[in-house]
UniProtKB/Swiss-Prot annotation:
GO terms for cellular component: cytoplasm; ribonuclease H2 complex. Keywords: Cytoplasm, Endonuclease, Hydrolase, Manganese, Metal-binding, Nuclease. CDD domains: RNase_HII_bacteria_HII_like (cd07182). The lineage of its organism: Bacteria, Bacillati, Actinomycetota, Actinomycetes, Kitasatosporales. Its cofactor is Mn(2+); Mg(2+). It holds the Pfam family RNase_HII. A divalent metal cation binds at residues 27-28, 119. This is Ribonuclease HII. It catalyses: Endonucleolytic cleavage to 5'-phosphomonoester.
């Protein structure tokens, strides 16, 4: 299929139908990884023409994605990132962890959005946020596509830094997702402090299965994420 750049169609529709003036596009990365955080970016772009070649981060080469992310960070009106740690994913489950990361991103923006465009069909944000879900929004919607690229590049950088400490796991190449190198290191060495211990991959590793658990916080609170992965977000 020929390349079709994302547009401001959804943003314009929200402005016309809801009166929203400040609209944030939101996308996540790391949902299916075995290690590392889930990362969410919220980006406010307005209706300006985006940098050339903007699309879903998964459709871009690493080199192009990295260059484009730098362009986008300068081009967007504002953006912010939120993360949910492996511990929080284990304690809360993925849907709640996504919401936690998304709220952190949205609340870190300099202005509260009037509406949010969320990639996908499932609204994991909910009330009080005014949400419009868009399937493949990271390909069709400018603000969501921008959030997709920024989130992907930032999380990849974080995982590459973790890979320095745990070189055998190949985090710089696989970003915490399953790969032959990652699986071999898990079988030999077991999970790192950055692995999600409630996930099914441990069922296939009998020597490490005893580590599988879903953690819960005794007081019902969720700890702050800063510092939990070894560097400042």
């Amino acid at each position: 299929m020929p390349y079709e750049p994302p547009t401001h169609t959804v943003e314009r529709s929200l402005r016309a139908t809801t009166g929203a003036k400040v609209i944030a596009g939101v996308d996540e990365v790391g949902r299916g990884a075995w290690a590392g955080p889930v990362t969410v970016c919220a980006a406010i772009t307005g209706l300006r023409r985006p940098p050339e070649g903007l699309t879903d981060s998964k459709l871009l080469t690493v080199k192009r994605r990295t260059v484009l992310a730098e362009e986008l960070r300068k081009w967007v009106t504002s953006y912010a990132l939120g993360h949910a740690s492996p511990e929080e994913i284990d304690a809360l489950g993925m849907t709640a962890a996504l919401r936690l990361a998304a709220v952190r991103a949205l609340e870190a923006l300099p202005v509260r959005p009037d509406a949010v465009i969320l990639d996908g069909k499932h609204d994991y944000l909910g009330s009080p946020w005014k949400v419009r879900t868009v399937i493949k929004g990271d390909q069709s919607c400018v603000a969501v596509a921008a959030a997709s690229v920024i989130a992907k590049v930032q999380r990849d950088k974080m995982m590459a830094e973790l890979g320095i400490e745990h070189a055998d796991f190949g985090f710089a190449a696989n970003a915490g997702y399953p790969s032959p190198v990652h699986k071999a290191a898990l079988a030999e060495r077991g999970p790192t402090p950055y692995h999600r211990l409630s996930w099914a991959y441990l069922d296939a590793l009998p020597q490490w299965r005893h580590l599988k658990k879903v953690r819960s916080w005794a007081d019902g609170s969720v700890p702050e994420i800063e510092g939990q992965l070894g560097f400042d977000f």
